[in-house]
Amino acid sequence: MKKSSDKSPVRQHDTATQINSDAVSSSTSFTDSDSTCSFLTPSMEFPDRISFRRIDFSEAAPTGVVLPSTSSELTRSNSSENKIPNEDISVSTSSRYLVFDKILALMKKSPGRRGDKTSPARRLDRSDAVRRNIDYDAGEDSSSLLITRSLDFPNRTSFRVDGVDDGEIDRIYQYIGVSGPEDFAISSDAWKARMEHERSSSDVVNKLKSLDLDSREAGPSGGVVASSSMNHKFQGHDLSEAGSIGVVVASNFTLSESNKIENLNSLRDKEIVDGDMVENRCGIERKPTILVKSRGYLVHNDDVGVGGGIKGVRPPVLNVPRADKEVVDGGTVESKSGIEWKPTILVKSKGYLVSNDGGIKGVTSPVLNLRPTDKEVVDSGTVENRRGIKGVRPSVLKPPPVMKLPPVDLPGSSWDILTHFAPDSEIVRRPSSSSSSENGCDEEEAEDDKVEKEETGDMFIQLEDTTDEACSFTTNEGDSSSTVSNTSPICVSGGSINTSWQKGQLLRQGSFGSVYEAISEDGDFFAVKEVSLLDQGSQAQECIQQLEGEIALLSQLEHQNILRYRGTDKDGSNLYIFLELVTQGSLLELYRRYQIRDSLISLYTKQILDGLKYLHHKGFIHRDIKCATILVDANGTVKLADFGLAKVSKLNDIKSRKETLFWMAPEVINRKDNDGYRSPADIWSLGCTVLEMCTGQIPYSDLEPVEALFRIRRGTLPEVPDTLSLDARHFILKCLKLNPEERPTATELLNHPFVRRPLPSSGSGSTSPLIRR
């Protein structure tokens, strides 16, 4: 900035004054938002004196920076109070330029000057004020004033939660300024109040819609509703003469002059209170057309006189829809909107529905034909519900016949075998399905008694032999079975036990119970098999009835190689099966005591085939061919025992099922229907039995029962030693064909060389087939 070349005092004075004004205007001062801060500003007067005045900056902006925009703050101190007489400073002409230089330096350092690139001066903050012992009294709302507008809205609008740190959610709450998820919750009281408000508003709208608003220019009245001017406040109307209706509706809800309601949805913005002035939510004042009740009529409020009467012609009564009525028998009914109406009520009088006018007057009202909903109509008569029968009593319908279920052969399936390997507590017994049939053994007695008899799937037998015959056999009689005492066994055929008997010593433990020797009163010895009923559970009675019916049929079989059944008896806890007594025991006991040669094995095999041929021809399947179930008498005659009992799975204990597994055919284990137990299954068991007699060991003797089960299922044959004769090996392998259709029948096997070899001669001349050492 150039200095003026003019040396006159007047020009120098004017120049200094202008420079001083610019310097002061570029100076800065600081204020606090909570208190007023003032400072001394130099007021220069040239050429006389330099004085100072105090300037108040209480009107400063919140930013804390005050920039004087005019030079009015620099005033000449001509008055006596602005001068400082004791501190006057004389300014010479030589020192004036020094002052100007200082002012210019100050102007260059000012941060508010344009084009200045120097760093701004340090800002005065509250910490400096405390150091300088300046008293500072912060107000209660000082913290809120310091927050700028930019801090009201966080600059971060999205957050990512990785789930690694446990404090991520807490930091988000802290960032947005809440303490936790509870700050977002709505209190139950506020929610209930809001719901009550919405419910009351919707009820009012429903009531207004139910009225015929088109026939009249208003609805029900009785309160105050504010409407229809945008520029006026609400005005309340006293409608105490309207009665106890309690509802006021404005008809001109739009800003037009028409009194009709053009938009019922505008009612959602109103809150109607009985007898009080109500303001709508939008704050818009409207002038309603109000209807009031006067002597039973709804009329305009302007037509009601001082005494409550109606001016001019009485208007017609509004037609309120029937849907708003609640009809109560014998009294006046109020509609839902609170308006009293006198409906036509029908009451029941002497069986007729008539008008409730205090009785039937004049012409009797027509009777309504109501359908007798409390009656039940039957083809042969009318039955009145819960009031007894009037008229002809209907006939009782005959129940439909019992549905016959297809017979199912459940015992011996692979599932039953697997479950029997489990402990006793884990075994789940299967219920047997049954259907009705008749007993062919005693048809005349069944016809006389007319008792329905049942056929159980467990007792169904399907066979296939040389004649391809198949038949089913009955079991028990349904409800006609009677309890037999110990002294009166069931008589089924000749040779049965008809007198009392006594149990003797134990002979052996059979597959289905213990076998004892017994004697009758006539001195006849026989064997009795004792089966415990306690082991059969809740289905013991059904199981025993099935077994009794089966034994009744087996008792009719007569063959030298078949063990004869002689009847049954039972008491409270046991079932007794009477059998033919065989003293020498089973083949299992025999080959354990003696060494049996091939010739004797061939003889026993021929007798077994004779017995199987007879059973298959009669329609029976043994199901349990093995050495333990084949008995030998004192003459060396082989007898098949325990046949037929294996069909009743309830009588099979766990031990017998494990032992029977080693002789089972693969189709029996893998079967899915009744085709598993057919005559070829007995042929497979016969081959295992011959192998057992030849080796003195049961088949699959080196395997556990479960492992043997899977071996048989996969079709793995038992080991046949090479030490056996060729005929014996060929006979065994012929019986152990995996395909049941490839196995020969019992009749065909009787022609095999293994069973047709000649019998050895006996030195004693005995005709017994048993060869003694």
UniProtKB/Swiss-Prot annotation:
It catalyses: L-seryl-[protein] + ATP = O-phospho-L-seryl-[protein] + ADP + H(+); L-threonyl-[protein] + ATP = O-phospho-L-threonyl-[protein] + ADP + H(+). Its EC number is 2.7.11.24. Gene3D superfamilies: Transferase(Phosphotransferase) domain 1. The gene is MEKK2. ATP binds at L507, R508, Q509, G510, S511, F512, G513, S514, V515, K529. Changing E667K: In summ1-5; suppression of impaired plant defense responses in mkk1 mkk2, mekk1 and mpk4 mutants. Residues 100-493 are annotated as: Regulatory region. Changing P740L: In summ1-2; suppression of impaired plant defense responses in mkk1 mkk2, mekk1 and mpk4 mutants. Changing S602F: In summ1-7; suppression of impaired plant defense responses in mkk1 mkk2, mekk1 and mpk4 mutants. The active site is at D624. The modification Phosphoserine is found at S79, S150, S365, S768. Expressed at least in rosette leaves (at protein level). Belongs to the protein kinase superfamily. STE Ser/Thr protein kinase family. MAP kinase kinase kinase subfamily. Residues 501-755 form the Protein kinase domain. InterPro entries: Kinase-like_dom_sf (IPR011009), MAP_kinase_kinase_kinase (IPR050538), Prot_kinase_dom (IPR000719). Pfam families: Pkinase (PF00069). Residues 21-35 have a biased composition (Low complexity). Phosphorylated by MPK4 upon treatment with flg22. Residues 1-14 have a biased composition (Basic and acidic residues). Transmembrane segments: none annotated. This is Mitogen-activated protein kinase kinase kinase 9.
